Each structure stands twice: as structure tokens, then as C-alpha cells.
């Protein structure tokens, strides 16, 4: 059910935000872009970024603490999304995350760079791109969950070594 008091509070906060934007000369637009809205909410609550672990339990990324559960009153209850942010953490017989926003994995690089580390992987010559490439895994520091795999161009001495090796192995068709 919708609580009229909460809806009035939301409306008042919205009005205050529009006033602040106007006062600072920022043009406000109304967006229906769910990803942009979701990212904004998640970025504001990033300290309570939680990752699903098992048996409906979550781990907080910031400090690695365990045993968070989605509150039964939450719209995400029973869904067990991989990542959520919580506006409230309440403790009763369990520790519950309330007022949650689901977070998409692809948002994490943008909204939570402070929680991400890099691990270099293989370096190779990419024939199609005609470049030396290094794969780099991006992962969450506390849980080591992979967030993304980036391919970056390698330059300098290391690129020369890989290129020469590819030439010697006839991986490069070099016209004379």
C-alpha cells in the first residue's frame, strides 16, 4: 500500500531539489530513463552496496560483513538480485536491508570505482585489430566477484616483445 505521509514527503523533497537546481542555474529535466534513475539512487547509497551470497543472504562490499537479508516488506524480497543498495539497515532477529534498489553489474565501474581492483591477465597480439592487447579483470575487492573484463592496448617495450613473438610464430602475415 502507499502511505500518503511518505508520498507528501517525497513530493516536498522533489520540490526542494528543483528549487536548489533552479537557484544554482541548473536546468532540470524529467527523465524516464530507468538506468539513469537507478544509477543515481545507487550512487547515493553506495556505502550499503550488498552482493548476494547464498541462502538469501548478502555481503556488504564496503567492509565484507555478512548476514544481510532483504526485508520482507521490500519489493525485491524473494527475487535475490545479485547486487542491491539499501537505504536502511535494521537489526531485529536478523539484519535486514530495507528500501532497496537493484544494481546492475555494468553500473559498478561507474558508481563504485572505490570498491574495484584490477588484475592483469593475458597479453597477446590481436590480428584483427593489428594491436597488442592486454586483458584486465575488474573485480570487487571484498568478494573478488568479476565486474568486467577490459581489453587495453599495450604500447612500449612489452608490445614490441609480443609483436616480435607473433612474427616469429607466423601469426602475422607481413607483406614484403
Locations of regions flagged by a protein language model:
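Acidic, serine/threonine- and proline-rich low-complexity intrinsically disordered segments
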Residues: 1-67, 80-176
